[in-house]
Amino acid sequence: MSDPRAKGGKGGAANAKNEPKKQTTQSARAGLQFPVGRIHRHLKSRTQNHVRIGAKAAVYTSAILEYLTAEVLELAGNASKDMRLKRITPRHLQLAIRGDEELDSMVRATIAGGGVLPHIHKTLIKAPSKKKALE
C-alpha cells in the first residue's frame, strides 16, 4: 500500500536527484526586460503609510515602462536615421517626443540639449508677389 502522506507535495524528479531548482526572475516569468523585483521594491519604499503593494502591480508597472521606453526609442531611432546618424542624441529624443501628439501631452518635461522644434507662424511668411509668379 502507498503511504497516505506521499500525496502531492513537492517531491519530484528534481528533488530526487538533489539538484537545486533553477531560479527564474519575475521579469523572465512575465516576459519583460525591465526589472520587476526592483520596481516592486521602489513601489513599496515610495508609498505613504507603507501600504501593501501587490505583485501584479509591479509587473504591470514594468510592462508600461518597457512599452513607453520602446516607443520613445523607436521614434528617436527613426529621427536619427533620417539625419543619417547612428547615435541617438537628446535632440532626437526631443523631436520624437514632440512629434508624437500623445507622448507630447504626457511628457511635459524640458529635455536638456534637445533644442526647440522649428516653427514659423504663417503671418510671418511673405506671400509670393504676383509679379514674380508671372515671370
Swiss-Prot record:
PTM summary: Acetylated once deposited into chromatin.
Entry-annotated residues carrying N6-acetyllysine: 10
GO CC terms of this entry: euchromatin; nucleosome; nucleus
Record-level Gene Ontology MF annotations: chromatin DNA binding; identical protein binding; protein heterodimerization activity; RNA polymerase II cis-regulatory region sequence-specific DNA binding; structural constituent of chromatin
Sequence segments annotated as region (Disordered): 1-33
Gene Ontology BP annotations: CENP-A eviction from euchromatin; heterochromatin formation; nuclear-transcribed mRNA catabolic process, non-stop decay; regulation of transcription by RNA polymerase II; silent mating-type cassette heterochromatin formation; transcription elongation by RNA polymerase II
Keyword Transcription: yes
InterPro entries xref list: Histone-fold (IPR009072), Histone_H2A (IPR002119), Histone_H2A/H2B/H3 (IPR007125), Histone_H2A_C (IPR032454), Histone_H2A_CS (IPR032458)
Subcellular location(s) per record: Nucleus; Chromosome
Pfam family, any one: Histone
Keyword Translocase attributed: no
Keywords attached to this entry: Acetylation, Activator, Chromatin regulator, Chromosome, DNA-binding, Nucleosome core, Nucleus, Transcription, Transcription regulation
Self-association state and partner proteins as the record states: The nucleosome is a histone octamer containing two molecules each of H2A, H2B, H3 and H4 assembled in one H3-H4 heterotetramer and two H2A-H2B heterodimers. The octamer wraps approximately 147 bp of DNA. H2A or its variant H2A.Z forms a heterodimer with H2B. H2A.Z associates with the VPS72/SWC2 subunit of the SWR1 chromatin remodeling complex. Also interacts with RBP1/DNA-directed RNA polymerase II largest subunit.
Similarity comment: family membership: Belongs to the histone H2A family.
Function, as annotated: Variant histone H2A which can replace H2A in some nucleosomes. Nucleosomes wrap and compact DNA into chromatin, limiting DNA accessibility to the cellular machineries which require DNA as a template. Histones thereby play a central role in transcription regulation, DNA repair, DNA replication and chromosomal stability. DNA accessibility is regulated via a complex set of post-translational modifications of histones, also called histone code, and nucleosome remodeling.
Name of the featured protein: Histone H2A.Z
Gene expressing this chain: HTZ1
